[in-house]
């Protein structure tokens, strides 16, 4: 597989059926052994599943212009455990917090953000906040939306 992406590809695991429901024939690549438990059908009705997390992320991308068109600003660029960034457009700011660590990581909101005033749009774990921050769970992601009020004239 050297020089190709074949080593990173496996058939989509649609169900717990033979060959993960991918084909009734012989798949080009072997199906992952975890397909009876990890498959689309098993995650379909679980609101906390990875499948539904990504569906919600895609919905936000389609519905919120700030996700698509907002200017980008990164926070904590030297961190090798957190990827934190802002998207800003008009009166909206989106704060995205992603942990790339298998271990818990302390997170403190950047200056100008009060997590309690933001609307938590997407989360992969809990929504616990303490002292304008939280301790991430392994590989946790959160997305907050902040809207500013129009200034009085």
Could you say what each language-model-derived stretch is?
Residues 17, 125-126:
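Residues that form or immediately flank small-molecule/cofactor binding pockets and catalytic motifs
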Residues 1-94, 102-106:
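Loop/helix patches that line or flank the sugar-binding groove of alpha-linked glycan CAZymes
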Residues 110-125:
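Solvent-exposed beta-hairpin/edge-strand motifs
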Residues 95-100, 127:
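Structural signature of nuclease core domains in nucleic-acid processing machines
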Residues 72-76, 127-129, 134:
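Short, exposed beta-strand/loop patches in secreted or surface proteins that constitute
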């Amino acid at each position: 597989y050297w020089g190709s992406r074949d080593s990173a590809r496996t058939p989509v695991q649609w169900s717990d059926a033979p060959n993960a429901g991918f084909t009734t024939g012989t798949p080009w690549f072997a199906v992952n052994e975890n397909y009876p438990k990890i498959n689309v059908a098993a995650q379909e009705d679980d609101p906390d599943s990875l499948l539904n997390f990504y569906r919600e992320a895609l919905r936000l991308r389609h519905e919120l212009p700030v996700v698509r068109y907002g200017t980008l600003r990164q926070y904590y660029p030297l961190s090798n455990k957190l990827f934190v960034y802002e998207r800003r457009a008009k009166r909206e700011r989106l704060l995205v917090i992603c942990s790339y660590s298998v271990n818990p990581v302390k997170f403190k909101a950047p200056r100008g953000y009060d997590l309690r005033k933001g609307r938590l749009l997407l989360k992969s774990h809990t929504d616990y906040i303490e002292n304008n921050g939280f301790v991430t769970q392994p590989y946790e992601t959160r997305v907050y939306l902040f809207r500013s009020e129009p200034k009085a004239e």
